[in-house]
């Protein structure tokens, strides 16, 4: 089976600004991928390249074994939900579904109708009158009912309250189970990603800082607390980030084997260590 996404030295430049630089990742099919990074890290650029909305400056990218947006058949295999869950405010819920059926050859109207009923959306309600959570549900339903092989979601829950976010993520997991579809989910909300993702890509400064299956990454990362002595780390260990207080140092360490005094680190702590290490610190500021 082809990987969902494969990139090699993928680079995107806007005039003098490098939005994405030398990005090399392989995402196995069927994964729920969390894409994390600060504003300006290159997340939306990478998603735009995956969906074929923009073209790379250099390097290569394959999505589901083919060039992104290589034709109508390839486009139908990828469902996309952009930031703020864009919908047509003057169209009703039912009109969105009819439009989806007209534009997508593999449209699953039964799936779309069931999901709309489950979330209590009025088919005659115009999208502009829906709540933020309802608009997100409608956008996700339209993307999933394409019956593609990959869903690409660009910060779809950023503006939602906790209950609406939970409902959205529940539906997303239902779609994954029912359709055997892969997902790339960009988000700043690490707690949400920790609940649903089994693969992680961390971007900062347009570069990949970390990528891999979550279970494997967590097994290789450890928190070591105590007196600041990196020399006591085993051979092959890599210090990712250290934070020092008046009395001790807390270090996030990557090592394939056991680390003396090491304790498990969660996805949030691991991710923040890489993001902090990749962020320039103003002169004189504490690290």
Label for each model-derived stretch:
Residues 36-38:
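The feature captures the beta-strand-to-loop junction immediately N-terminal to the Walker
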Residues 51:
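Helix-to-loop junction immediately C-terminal to a conserved catalytic motif
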Residues 59-74:
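Conserved ABC transporter NBD signature motif
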Residues 83-138:
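ABC-family P-loop ATPase nucleotide-binding domains
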Residues 151-155, 160:
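Catalytic Walker B motif of ABC-type/P-loop ATPase nucleotide-binding domains
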Residues 166-253:
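ABC transporter nucleotide-binding domain
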